[in-house]
Amino acid sequence: MVRPVMTDLMDDLAYQIHEYLLEEATPFKGGYLVLIPITDIVKKFQKNHRTINRRISALKDEGLLEPLIKKTYSTLYWVKDPDEENG
């Protein structure tokens, strides 16, 4: 059995995660910082860790999320708001 390959992980869930991170973030020097455990995101969206991690990776690939400090259970992210960059 061949598993289907998900080529586009920037779906509604990824954008919802991005919006959630922006809501939780603290404004800092023209951007936003958020320190959040992955388990908080998993609980919020009621999805498994693998699904959430794939969407976070897609957000990183799109340049909307930049990990600054990564620890075992949480990560400090620089969250970019595309509305502010284009406005």
PLM segments and residue spans:
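A short, conserved structural fragment
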Residues: 60-70
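Short, cationic-aromatic polyanion-contact patches
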Residues: 10, 70-87
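Residues in the recognition helix of alpha-helical DNA-binding motifs
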Residues: 55
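Short helix->loop/beta-hairpin flanking segments within DNA-binding domains
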Residues: 7-35
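Short intrinsically disordered terminal tails
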Residues: 1-2, 6, 43, 83-87
